[in-house]
């Protein structure tokens, strides 16, 4: 792989409050990975990275395998696509542990590129609907069907 244009320092996110702050930031799902990207307000250029897997994807063995694969994918892709002073949280999805390696790397890369492009466009937040599906939280010109008037 090519070297990053600038050398970034990486640290792991380990504390729950950091994960909760990232949960309020823009996020994107691609294939077997869900990534949250939070821009910090401090002047520290360090990139902080966290990994998580819920019990929905399986038992401890499956969760650990998924997180190991996400850590390695992040180690390879983040130096090329991470932004200084940002926190990234990688959340394993159902196929993370079994997805073909090249496809998982592509999922991570395209998610990071899309999140960065979204931030450059103004950072519309991606959020969850009540049914768990993702939608763009930017204001829509469509009237809200739940509002009568």
Swiss-Prot record:
One Gene Ontology molecular-function label: ribonuclease P activity
Segments of this protein annotated with the region Disordered: 123-149
Reactions mediated catalytically: Endonucleolytic cleavage of RNA, removing 5'-extranucleotides from tRNA precursor
Keywords carried by this UniProt record: Endonuclease, Hydrolase, Nuclease, RNA-binding, tRNA processing
One BP term from GO: tRNA 5'-leader removal
GO cellular component entries: ribonuclease P complex
Function as written in the Swiss-Prot or TrEMBL entry: RNaseP catalyzes the removal of the 5'-leader sequence from pre-tRNA to produce the mature 5'-terminus. It can also cleave other RNA substrates such as 4.5S RNA. The protein component plays an auxiliary but essential role in vivo by binding to the 5'-leader sequence and broadening the substrate specificity of the ribozyme.
UniProt subunit comment: Consists of a catalytic RNA component (M1 or rnpB) and a protein subunit.
Protein name: Ribonuclease P protein component
Species assigned in the record: Caulobacter vibrioides (strain NA1000 / CB15N) (Caulobacter crescentus)
């Amino acid at each position: 792989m090519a070297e990053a244009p600038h050398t970034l320092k990486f640290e792991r996110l380990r504390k729950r409050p950091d994960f909760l702050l990232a949960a309020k930031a823009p996020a994107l799902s691609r294939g077997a990975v869900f990534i949250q990207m939070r821009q910090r307000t401090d002047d520290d250029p360090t990139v902080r990275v966290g990994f998580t897997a819920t019990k929905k994807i399986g038992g401890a063995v499956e969760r650990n395998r998924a997180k190991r694969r996400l850590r390695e994918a992040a180690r390879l892709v983040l130096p090329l696509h991470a932004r200084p002073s940002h926190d990234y949280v990688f959340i394993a999805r159902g196929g993370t542990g079994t997805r073909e390696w090249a496809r998982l790397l592509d999922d991570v890369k395209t998610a990071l590129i899309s999140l960065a492009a979204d931030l450059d466009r103004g950072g519309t937040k991606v959020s969850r609907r009540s049914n768990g599906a993702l939608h763009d939280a930017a204001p829509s010109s469509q009237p809200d069907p739940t509002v009568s008037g």
